[in-house]
C-alpha cells in the first residue's frame, strides 16, 4: 500500500490596522452600512489616482523585521487583472515580482497528539514573501430576489498577504503555524486578528505525493478559511479526497475549492489560475516603493519586545520553565498582565503568579468566554491574594474562594482580598496550640484510620489530614497539620 506525504503551503491575508484604506482616505471601520465607506478612488471613478498609505507600509516593515526577513529597499506595485463585480477597476493593485518583504521564518510549536501517538515538537516554517495589496469588495447573494448586491466598503482595505514555502506536512502543523502567525500580527499591533470580521483569513494549498517522491503532486487551493477549526477540517478532508481519488485511478485537478462547514467538506469553485492568467504589469499610477535604512531603523526602534525575546527573559528573570514562558507570552495582553502581577506581588512570587495565571485565571476566563484584557480581577487585586498565600494568612484553597468572590462581585478596590478575609473570617489557623487541640479530637474520633496508618497504609494519613482540614473549615495551615499529625502519630 502506498504511503502518502502531505504537502501544505498557506497564504494568509492579514488586514492591516490602519484607520484609512491603502490607496485612499476612506475609513476601514467594520460594520458600516453598505457603500458608505467607498470614496471615488475605491469606486474607480474616472480621473482618480491612488495615494499609498504610509501606515500600511510601516506595518509591513514591522512584520518583516519581526520574522527576520529582508525588507526590500525598492519594491513595485502591480496590477492583477481579472473581472469580478466587486472589483470596480477591473484589476487589483498588488505586488508581484518585487514584494516589500522577502523571506523570513516563523518557529511553531506543534502540540502532542496522544491518539496518533505523536509527541509535541517545534518546527521552523520558512516564508516566501509578504506583499501589500488592496482587498476587493463583497458580493451579497441573499435578500436580492435572485440578484447580487455589491458592497464596496471593503474595496481598498489594506492587506498583507503572507506566503509560506510548501513545508507543512499535516493539518496540525498548518494550524500551529496559523495560530503562531495570528498571535504575532496581533502582538505587533499590525492586525486586530478578528477572524469573524475577515481580518485574518487563510488560503490552504494542499497536495499529496508518495513518500520519498521529490516532485510535488497537483495542488488544490482552499479559499477563505476564517477559523482554525475550519482550516484543520478542510485540510484533513482535502487530503482524504485526493488520496482516495488517486488510489481509485483518478487524477487531482488544479483548482480552487471552497470549504462547506456544515457538510465539513470541500467543493470545487473554479479551475485554478496561474500567474500568467492575471497579466501582471507594474502599475503606472504608483511610483516604486523606496524604503531607506533610516526608515527601517526608526520602525525597528518603535517595535515592542518580541515574544521569543520575552520568553527567554521570563525564563532568566523569573525562573519559570520554557513551557510556562511560552504560555505566558501567548498573547501580548497575557504577558503584560503577568508582568504587572509580578511587579505587585514581588519577584519572589513569580512562579506562584505564573501557576495562578495559567491555572485558576485561565480557567475562569474560559468559563466566561473572555480574554485576559477583559479580566474582572486586576493584577493588583490578584497580587494581594498571592501575597496573603505567601505570608501564610490564607491557604491556597481559601485563596481560590477569595479570587472567585472578587471575580463574581467585580470588586473595584485593590484591597478586596483583605476586605473579604476580614469580613468572612478566613484567616488561616496557624496557632500551634489551637491546631494540636483540633488534631487530638480528630485522632480520637478516627481511631480506625490511626490503626491503618500504623499498619503501613499511607492513604489513612491523607484521610486524617482531610478530617483535620474539615474540622477547621479549610482554615488550618496544611503544612502545620501535616507536621503535627506526623509528630503525634510517631
Swiss-Prot record:
The keyword Transport does not apply. Keywords: ATP-binding, Ligase, Nucleotide-binding, Protein biosynthesis. NCBIfam families: gatB (TIGR00133), PRK05477.1-2 (NF004012), PRK05477.1-4 (NF004014), PRK05477.1-5 (NF004015). Allows the formation of correctly charged Asn-tRNA(Asn) or Gln-tRNA(Gln) through the transamidation of misacylated Asp-tRNA(Asn) or Glu-tRNA(Gln) in organisms which lack either or both of asparaginyl-tRNA or glutaminyl-tRNA synthetases. The reaction takes place in the presence of glutamine and ATP through an activated phospho-Asp-tRNA(Asn) or phospho-Glu-tRNA(Gln). The keyword ATP-binding applies. Heterotrimer of A, B and C subunits. The gene is gatB. Belongs to the GatB/GatE family. GatB subfamily. It catalyses: L-glutamyl-tRNA(Gln) + L-glutamine + ATP + H2O = L-glutaminyl-tRNA(Gln) + L-glutamate + ADP + phosphate + H(+); L-aspartyl-tRNA(Asn) + L-glutamine + ATP + H2O = L-asparaginyl-tRNA(Asn) + L-glutamate + ADP + phosphate + 2 H(+). HAMAP family: GatB. Its EC number is 6.3.5.-. This is Aspartyl/glutamyl-tRNA(Asn/Gln) amidotransferase subunit B. Disulfide bonds: none annotated. GO terms for molecular function: asparaginyl-tRNA synthase (glutamine-hydrolyzing) activity; ATP binding; glutaminyl-tRNA synthase (glutamine-hydrolyzing) activity. It holds the Pfam family GatB_Yqey. GO terms for biological process: glutaminyl-tRNAGln biosynthesis via transamidation; translation. It is an enzyme of class 6 (ligase). It comes from the Bacteria.
Amino acid at each position: 500500500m502506498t504511503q502518502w506525504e502531505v504537502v501544505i503551503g498557506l497564504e494568509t491575508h492579514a488586514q492591516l490596522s490602519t484607520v484609512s484604506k491603502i490607496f485612499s482616505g476612506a475609513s476601514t471601520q467594520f460594520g458600516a452600512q453598505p457603500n458608505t465607506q467607498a470614496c471615488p478612488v475605491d469606486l474607480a471613478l474616472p480621473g482618480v489616482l491612488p495615494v499609498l498609505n504610509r501606515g500600511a507600509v510601516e506595518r509591513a516593515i514591522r512584520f518583516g523585521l519581526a520574522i527576520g526577513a529582508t525588507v526590500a529597499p525598492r519594491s513595485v506595485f502591480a496590477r492583477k487583472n481579472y473581472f469580478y463585480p466587486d472589483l470596480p477597476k477591473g484589476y487589483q493593485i498588488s505586488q508581484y515580482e518585487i514584494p516589500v518583504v522577502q523571506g523570513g521564518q516563523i518557529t511553531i510549536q506543534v502540540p502532542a497528539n496522544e491518539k496518533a501517538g505523536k509527541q509535541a515538537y517545534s518546527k521552523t516554517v520558512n516564508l516566501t514573501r509578504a506583499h501589500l495589496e488592496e482587498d476587493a469588495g463583497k458580493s451579497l447573494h441573499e435578500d436580492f430576489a435572485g440578484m447580487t448586491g455589491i458592497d464596496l466598503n471593503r474595496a481598498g482595505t489594506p492587506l498583507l498577504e503572507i506566503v509560506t514555502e510548501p513545508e507543512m506536512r499535516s493539518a496540525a502543523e498548518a494550524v500551529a503555524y496559523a495560530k503562531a502567525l495570528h498571535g504575532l500580527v496581533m502582538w505587533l499591533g499590525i492586525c486586530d486578528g478578528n477572524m469573524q470580521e475577515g481580518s485574518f483569513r487563510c488560503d490552504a494549498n494542499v497536495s499529496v505525493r508518495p513518500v520519498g517522491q521529490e516532485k510535488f503532486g497537483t495542488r488544490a487551493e482552499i479559499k477563505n478559511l476564517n477559523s482554525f477549526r475550519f482550516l484543520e477540517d478542510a485540510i484533513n478532508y482535502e487530503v482524504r479526497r485526493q488520496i482516495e481519488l488517486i488510489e481509485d485511478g483518478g487524477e487531482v485537478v488544479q483548482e480552487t475549492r471552497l470549504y462547506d462547514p456544515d457538510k465539513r467538506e470541500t467543493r470545487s469553485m473554479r479551475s485554478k489560475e496561474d500567474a500568467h492568467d492575471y497579466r501582471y504589469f507594474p502599475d503606472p499610477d504608483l511610483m516604486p516603493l523606496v524604503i531607506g535604512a533610516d526608515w527601517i531603523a526608526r520602525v525597528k526602534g518603535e517595535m515592542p519586545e518580541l515574544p521569543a525575546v520575552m520568553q527567554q527573559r521570563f525564563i532568566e528573570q523569573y525562573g519559570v520553565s520554557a513551557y510556562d514562558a511560552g504560555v505566558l507570552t501567548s498573547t501580548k495582553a497575557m504577558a503584560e498582565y503577568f508582568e504587572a502581577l509580578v511587579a505587585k506581588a514581588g519577584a519572589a512570587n513569580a512562579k506562584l503568579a505564573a501557576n495562578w495565571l495559567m491555572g485558576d485565571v485561565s480557567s475562569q476566563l474560559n468559563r466566561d468566554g473572555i480574554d485576559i484584557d477583559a479580566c474582572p480581577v486586576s493584577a493588583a487585586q490578584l497580587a494581594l491574594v498571592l501575597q496573603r498565600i505567601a505570608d501564610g494568612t490564607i491557604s491556597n484553597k481559601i485563596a481560590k474562594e477569595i479570587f472567585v468572590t472578587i471575580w463574581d462581585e467585580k470588586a473595584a478596590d485593590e484591597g478586596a482580598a483583605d476586605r473579604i478575609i476580614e469580613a468572612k473570617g478566613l484567616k488561616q489557623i496557624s496557632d500551634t496550640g489551637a491546631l494540636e487541640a483540633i488534631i487530638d479530637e480528630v485522632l480520637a474520633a478516627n481511631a480506625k484510620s490511626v490503626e491503618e496508618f500504623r499498619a503501613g497504609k499511607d492513604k489513612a494519613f491523607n484521610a486524617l489530614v482531610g478530617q483535620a482540614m474539615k474540622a477547621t473549615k479549610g482554615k488550618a495551615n496544611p503544612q502545620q497539620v501535616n507536621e503535627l499529625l506526623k509528630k503525634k502519630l510517631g
